[in-house]
Amino acid sequence: MSFPQLGYQYIRPLYPSERPGAAGGSGGSAGARGGLGAGASELNASGSLSNVLSSVYGAPYAAAAAAAAAQGYGAFLPYAAELPIFPQLGAQYELKDSPGVQHPAAAAAFPHPHPAFYPYGQYQFGDPSRPKNATRESTSTLKAWLNEHRKNPYPTKGEKIMLAIITKMTLTQVSTWFANARRRLKKENKMTWAPRSRTDEEGNAYGSEREEEDEEEDEEDGKRELELEEEELGGEEEDTGGEGLADDDEDEEIDLENLDGAATEPELSLAGAARRDGDLGLGPISDSKNSDSEDSSEGLEDRPLPVLSLAPAPPPVAVASPSLPSPPVSLDPCAPAPAPASALQKPKIWSLAETATSPDNPRRSPPGAGGSPPGAAVAPSALQLSPAAAAAAAHRLVSAPLGKFPAWTNRPFPGPPPGPRLHPLSLLGSAPPHLLGLPGAAGHPAAAAAFARPAEPEGGTDRCSALEVEKKLLKTAFQPVPRRPQNHLDAALVLSALSSS
């Protein structure tokens, strides 16, 4: 047998083939003949086995194995109960409480713990340096000191050290106990001391724990004062919108509610001036106002545009620029102008959209159009846009600007109007600068009068009204971009190709 995992070597070849009892069924002559030789071979085998085992396991185990081999067990090792080899190997897997067989050296190296030893910490039971838990006996001293100092329950550093020595507690435990006691008295409305700030005469004499509590008291007092001020002046502050409270969340709420308050009016006026300069081609457009108009018109993409009404006026000078077809928008020249009071009834949330889509005024009229009739410029009250219409129109123009004419050239109008129509290339010379973005362009009265179209048959009324409405939206809602002249040239070329075909 072989046990390589335990270190036992295969020792069967050490014994000769002739052994007593190996041929049990043989005759007596054979047993008598091999008796002496067998005994000598057993001695030799036992001696050689003892030599091998002594080199592997040591003298005690080699002697036991040799004795077992001398008794005729052959290569089988004696697994006797008195042999302590397996308890020796399995001692490390036994429990500490079990009285297992242990090696004397291991027993000397790892003695059992002494009963007086405290095994779960660095302190023994009788160690005076071990921190003591707060008991009634120890806290009675602290309670007595607190009752004597109810008007000033803040012990100094020296008093804390003295109390810690008397009660056998640490400074941290003493400070924590006093902090909890003051907090408990405060909750029970038994405060007999005046709350002090950190800037008093004795502020530097107190510890950090005292300063933290004073800071908490100051914060609570400040919060109470703020709550009282909010209850008294809350309505006035919301109306003005210019004064902020100490709380950041309340400031944000005020800013969200007062989108068109006094704080935003200067920005809107500056943005309006910049937009007028952009219409005249004098400066770049304002990205912030465009983003405001886009934000105010979000969520209205699927809504149809309501009906817009224009007051009756002389034929306008501005040429109807090529624009998107908008069947839902209609124009009624005979409808009266809405009352100016409707602007006051609009919600506050649409104030930015109203500012972005306000109708043009005499200050925004181009200086180059000198030949236009005096009534050509529409008054601000002549074109009143509802909030939804203004926001939706602004969003619609953003989604499909004039620079994307080739994207919808496969959707032409149903048919040309029966009336006379000039070539679209005349736009380059007759359109005002705020439509084409050309700073030096001048208006031609003849071409403008030809494009006025005072009367048309019913077949072209819808399309003419759509062009007029889009023209007004172009004048009021958006400003020119740097590449706008090239876009107009492309649009004019596309429309000329469509009309020629």
UniProtKB/Swiss-Prot annotation:
<feature type="modified residue" description="Phosphoserine">
    <location>
        <position position="323"/>
    </location>
</feature>
<dbReference type="InterPro" id="IPR017970">
    <property type="entry name" value="Homeobox_CS"/>
</dbReference>
<dbReference type="GO" id="GO:0001656">
    <property type="term" value="P:metanephros development"/>
</dbReference>
<comment type="function">
    <text>Transcription factor involved in SHH-dependent neural patterning. Together with NKX2-2 and NKX6-1 acts to restrict the generation of motor neurons to the appropriate region of the neural tube. Belongs to the class I proteins of neuronal progenitor factors, which are repressed by SHH signals. Involved in the transcriptional repression of MNX1 in non-motor neuron cells. Acts as a regulator of energy metabolism.</text>
</comment>
<keyword id="KW-0597">Phosphoprotein</keyword>
<dbReference type="GO" id="GO:0045666">
    <property type="term" value="P:positive regulation of neuron differentiation"/>
</dbReference>
<dbReference type="GO" id="GO:0030424">
    <property type="term" value="C:axon"/>
</dbReference>
<dbReference type="GO" id="GO:0000122">
    <property type="term" value="P:negative regulation of transcription by RNA polymerase II"/>
</dbReference>
<dbReference type="GO" id="GO:0000981">
    <property type="term" value="F:DNA-binding transcription factor activity, RNA polymerase II-specific"/>
</dbReference>
<keyword id="KW-0804">Transcription</keyword>
<dbReference type="GO" id="GO:0000785">
    <property type="term" value="C:chromatin"/>
</dbReference>
<dbReference type="GO" id="GO:0048468">
    <property type="term" value="P:cell development"/>
</dbReference>
<dbReference type="GO" id="GO:0005737">
    <property type="term" value="C:cytoplasm"/>
</dbReference>
<feature type="compositionally biased region" description="Pro residues">
    <location>
        <begin position="324"/>
        <end position="339"/>
    </location>
</feature>
<feature type="modified residue" description="Phosphoserine">
    <location>
        <position position="326"/>
    </location>
</feature>
<dbReference type="GO" id="GO:0000978">
    <property type="term" value="F:RNA polymerase II cis-regulatory region sequence-specific DNA binding"/>
</dbReference>
<dbReference type="InterPro" id="IPR001356">
    <property type="entry name" value="HD"/>
</dbReference>
<dbReference type="InterPro" id="IPR008422">
    <property type="entry name" value="KN_HD"/>
</dbReference>
<dbReference type="GO" id="GO:0030182">
    <property type="term" value="P:neuron differentiation"/>
</dbReference>
<keyword id="KW-0805">Transcription regulation</keyword>
<feature type="region of interest" description="Disordered">
    <location>
        <begin position="190"/>
        <end position="381"/>
    </location>
</feature>
<keyword id="KW-0238">DNA-binding</keyword>
<keyword id="KW-0371">Homeobox</keyword>
<dbReference type="GO" id="GO:0003167">
    <property type="term" value="P:atrioventricular bundle cell differentiation"/>
</dbReference>
<dbReference type="GO" id="GO:0060932">
    <property type="term" value="P:His-Purkinje system cell differentiation"/>
</dbReference>
<feature type="compositionally biased region" description="Acidic residues">
    <location>
        <begin position="227"/>
        <end position="258"/>
    </location>
</feature>
<dbReference type="GO" id="GO:0001228">
    <property type="term" value="F:DNA-binding transcription activator activity, RNA polymerase II-specific"/>
</dbReference>
<comment type="similarity">
    <text>Belongs to the TALE/IRO homeobox family.</text>
</comment>
<dbReference type="GO" id="GO:0003165">
    <property type="term" value="P:Purkinje myocyte development"/>
</dbReference>
<dbReference type="GO" id="GO:0001227">
    <property type="term" value="F:DNA-binding transcription repressor activity, RNA polymerase II-specific"/>
</dbReference>
<dbReference type="InterPro" id="IPR009057">
    <property type="entry name" value="Homeodomain-like_sf"/>
</dbReference>
<feature type="compositionally biased region" description="Acidic residues">
    <location>
        <begin position="210"/>
        <end position="220"/>
    </location>
</feature>
<dbReference type="InterPro" id="IPR003893">
    <property type="entry name" value="Iroquois_homeo"/>
</dbReference>
<feature type="DNA-binding region" description="Homeobox; TALE-type">
    <location>
        <begin position="125"/>
        <end position="188"/>
    </location>
</feature>
<keyword id="KW-0678">Repressor</keyword>
<dbReference type="GO" id="GO:0006357">
    <property type="term" value="P:regulation of transcription by RNA polymerase II"/>
</dbReference>
<keyword id="KW-0217">Developmental protein</keyword>
<dbReference type="GO" id="GO:1901844">
    <property type="term" value="P:regulation of cell communication by electrical coupling involved in cardiac conduction"/>
</dbReference>
<keyword id="KW-0539">Nucleus</keyword>
<dbReference type="GO" id="GO:1990837">
    <property type="term" value="F:sequence-specific double-stranded DNA binding"/>
</dbReference>
<protein>
    <recommendedName>
        <fullName>Iroquois-class homeodomain protein IRX-3</fullName>
    </recommendedName>
</protein>
<dbReference type="GO" id="GO:0005634">
    <property type="term" value="C:nucleus"/>
</dbReference>
